Design a protein with these regions (language model features):
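Exposed, flexible binding/inhibitory loops of compact, secreted disulfide-stabilized domains
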Residues: 1-67
């Protein structure tokens, strides 16, 4: 069975809840919750999921592994 690598269903959800769900689905990856304008490193990391939130703390981009 393949492991989950993206969470389109979390767009529109509070970022804190999204991070919790990703952690439950994939405890082997680190979850980074990023506010608008946060600096990003361009490195590829297959053990990371970035959760991009808007000014209201809502996920606005599909969280995916390694992006």
């Amino acid at each position: 069975m393949s492991q989950k690598s993206s969470w389109p269903e979390l767009v529109g959800v509070l970022a804190t809840l999204a991070a919790t769900q990703i952690g439950k689905d994939r405890p082997d990856v680190a979850v980074e919750v990023l506010p608008p304008g946060a600096p990003l490193t361009p490195d590829f990391n297959d053990k990371r999921v970035r959760v991009f939130m808007d000014d209201n703390g809502i996920v606005f981009k599909i969280p995916v592994i390694a992006k």
